Amino acid sequence: MKKFNLLLFFLLVVVVFGSQGTLIFKGTDQYNLFLGRNLIDGRTLFIANTAIPEGFASLQVEQPTVKTAAVTNTFLRVTPQFLIHNFEPFKQKGWLQSVVPLYLRYRYDTLKPWLVLGFESEVSDNITGFINLDIPKDYRSYISHGDNFDSKPYMNFPVELFEGKLEALDMSWPTFGYVSYASNNFYASLGRYKVAWGPMRNGLTISDASSYYDNISSSYTTPLWKNGRFTYSFLVITPTSLLNEEEWVKQGKVWDLNQRRPYTEGAKTIIGHRFDVQFSTWGRLGVGELNVVGGKHPDLNDANPFIIFHNTYGEDFSNVMASLDLSLVPFKGIELYGEIAIDDVSFGSTEAGARGKPTALAYGGGLRYAMDIKGTLLLASVELYHTDTWMYNRWQPLLTFTNRIYTKSELPGSRDFTDYPLGFKYGSDLNGFSIMANAIMTNGLSISFVYEHFKQGEVTLKTPYLNMEEPEDDPGEFTAPEDWSGPVGETVNANILKLNMMIPYRNFTFGSDFSLYFGDYFKKNGGYEKPIFEIRPYLSYVF
């Protein structure tokens, strides 16, 4: 009966959407229910990528898909959210620069949009289209407290409109939308949404830390051996290729010993290939490869869906990373998993020399536990992380493993770049761990707790690669082999605690989140001597 209650709730969530093309995203209650149910049954997922289509999800849980009629459902969601916090205004202006600390951007990304107009189209049993017009609060009015840094925000609605300031109406939307086709064995989508690779909650190769990725994704899956599956995935991401004047100068220089000439077209493309081998219902191995092509538009040599590179030998315009991850379910309800991302390994003639690229790895592992308590799903995990000193970095701005997003603000006026790390959410040169617990009840009540801690050295993604300001420079500080693993220099500690609660009732959703930040990391990146907190209760209604 316990499993039946959990299964019933899971099916109710899925049936709302119907089409096999509807996508499920990591970190949502729907995904956690999907993941938890499989762990309770002693199964690992045959694909560790998200978004995952419901066609694949129905295959994973061995449930038939639901036939649907072609229809478009329109909704209008209004969400007033109130803000109680002791954050100081962030006063450093950015004009085509990445100056805002990542924790402040992540804080903004989780703020509810005050108005969402959505069109969800079930085109057929296999095709879903989703158009989402989400209007958020102006970015800088939230983190910088208005034009004069003295208008402390108290809600997500642009109250400055009542003062006649039409510029308070943020126009940096939308952040979500897609069209997707899926069956039980094939999936393809085009859109703007969160993407993630691997089993870790905070991924090291591609994480869902970015507010979105503009991407094309595709996968196919087939039975393998007696109880396994083989799944192949192809991905193309196109971050903004906007650079500021200083970055264009760096992009136009020859840095690499193997580089023949600079490539300076306004283009950056991230191409990913990955296969997952589920060798048994209790085990899965994933192998992936990412190729960042920058300064030129990719051709079929760069973006062939079925050619996987160790090295493109395109040092002028290419940066390649490999990944390996493993998931094991030795007992029902327990999952052991790990991931390693390999940017560079310094050995042999291709990497040797004083100005060769250093070894740069990111690796981590975790333990996940799921159980059903009288119809309530409890999902908990502990994860450990390490990123090397120069991970995700590169001389040429268009070859870093980052997803740049451009945000336009008017209160105060700013044109901000946010360079989200493609992998671990806080970047390079650190050790960290996290604890997560999520309880989801049959009435829809969801409570989650997350604690994250990391110790970071002096090298970040804003640090010039190998501390070289010019190509003729010798590598600077923290570039000797003994410094490659990090953290290096003067380290700082960060502690982030988050508590979220949400319960739906008919067309209403009631919820709140609480965040607490403390540690000398926030003194270095914000000047905070004492802990900082934020409480954000909200009420959402769907028309």
Question: What do these predicted ranges mean?
Answer:
Residues 19-27:
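Cleaved targeting-peptide boundary
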Residues 10-18:
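Hydrophobic h-region of N-terminal signal peptides that target proteins for export
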Residues 26-284, 352-361, 365, 376-383, ...:
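Outer-membrane beta-barrel channel domains
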